[in-house]
Amino acid sequence: MTKLKLGDYNRLKIVKRVDFGLYLDGGPEGEVLLPKRYVPQGANIGDEIEVFLYLDIDERLVATTEHPVAKVGEFACLEVAWVNEYGAFLKWGLMKDLFCPFREQKMRMEVGKSYVVHIHIDEESYRIVASAKVERYLDNTRHPDLKAGEKVQLLVWQKSPIGFKEIVKNRYAGLVYDDQVFRLVHHGDRCDGYVSNIRPDGKLDITLQPTGREQTLSFADTLLEYLHT
């Protein structure tokens, strides 16, 4: 079988049923527990099921059928659930909150506030952790997979003096200039945008409105909708 992916989705075979859940075949990693509360109805020994793998409070590999807001390698805007002397713990859709150590915070995180973070595996502890220092995880090299006018997915990262910084396609740094914003935009919003320019430094200029032919078609659709109201 392929190597298990911590902080990601895996398809694993059910090999044993116990009172407190199911054990799944983790290959060289050994059997992985899927606690009873997450066992799907009708699951039988020999079936393969998709599960998300993470470490429980005792740092043991465990499976869940819940879906977190994001997985390892992705960016997300997450709310702080609680803090202690080691860092902040963020809500990400699983029973165990996601840890963001103080060294990975740009400013001290506060309970109830939301922050854009990158999710990754800490090389020293092998834990799934978050980092608010997202710049180090953005790719500013050339973008062979992008072209001007292309529609892309955006995560609004932070406000700058000239516009809104965006994370483009969960990988690149982009900017929407203030004069290109014609609707309310909030920190942490996910939306679609369009590449208007690829700069020499690798960063992207983004617009929230279609460009070129797509802009004409969008305007035509809006006009037709208006005429039929």
Briefly describe each language-model feature range.
Residues 1-229:
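Single-stranded RNA-binding regions, centering on S1/OB-family and related RNA-binding modules
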